């Protein structure tokens, strides 16, 4: 069973659902390509499927997770979701393993009023319940604190109408110690025995130390070879901490001198807005299909057959200072000229979310990604003219 919700269902996901006859619960009138070919179920059927206990369940979006607490408040998956989705509860559960890791929960009012001189800079501030990189800020020193919190408050005001409180809680925040190291994003499911099965392994790129955007993720033979085995072992530890069984997750981690520290875990879904489909282009793994068939990628064989290219996902977003509803048009053709080899270009509905395009692309090295990270996307966006009376 797959639960589909806004903001986005890709053609590939819809085709995978149709081909594999996966039952669907549709929420909030989300647009589903070729909807007539899929098996739609009622929301009430969710509890029936959960009680059966033998059917894999996946969400395509954070937005739909709140139906678990409504229709199955006492189910194991609801409990696990609540723990993993709440960053404070997540950190508390991990604290026996990461004993020296600083974190604290505060309200927005407390963020504005607290004395920052007592904080162990550099720190990260982010919503306790959040999505993507919205509201995530790195603060390196006391002098940066107040201006950053002002910006955070503004972001929360802008996004409060775009996401429900179950997706982004704009009143409760976590302050935590900065996690150093290279960042990876992993799509994985856990078998009935709690064994992790890695379906996707991506590396994240940043423009600079304070960049928290999701603009570039990439993968390659080197990325997989350098990290697969150690991440697999780490996921076994995570599985034991949270008793993860028969559950898919998207986990973000950092690796520094072979120490792996989780940043956050997104339960019951894979990388959002189509990011997980980079695996199809890079090494032929359709995460959704593998999960529902409970198949395991043969990573040794996959790596042996891969070329030496860099396979990347670019998430082109409208700046948080711009109201999406003020966007008139995007010059997609001009934007496309920034890519050497486009594998797939997906324009998005700009007035519904901050993402105006997602692009899967291929390059011989990381130079194209570095250039894309530094590209000013505002030049491709046309806004409504302001009329002053």
Listing of model-derived features with the role each one plays in the protein:
Residues 239-274, 304-309, 315-323:
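Conserved metal-phosphate-binding beta-hairpin within the catalytic cores
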Residues 177-180, 187-243, 266-295:
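ATP-dependent carboxylate/phosphate-activation module, predominantly the ATP-grasp catalytic core
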Residues 29-118, 364-376:
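Conserved N-proximal alpha/beta basic substrate-recognition cap immediately N-terminal to
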Residues 292-389:
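Peripheral (often C-terminal) accessory segments that flank ATP-dependent C-N-forming ligase machineries
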Residues 123-152, 183-187, 207-223:
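Glycine-rich phosphate-binding loop of ATP-grasp-fold ATP-dependent ligases
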Residues 1-36:
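Short, charged N-terminal beta->alpha structural module
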Residues 100, 142-180, 241, 386-387:
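Conserved ATP-binding module of the ATP-grasp superfamily
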Residues 140, 190-196, 255-258:
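Short acidic-glycine loop/turn motifs at beta-strand connectors
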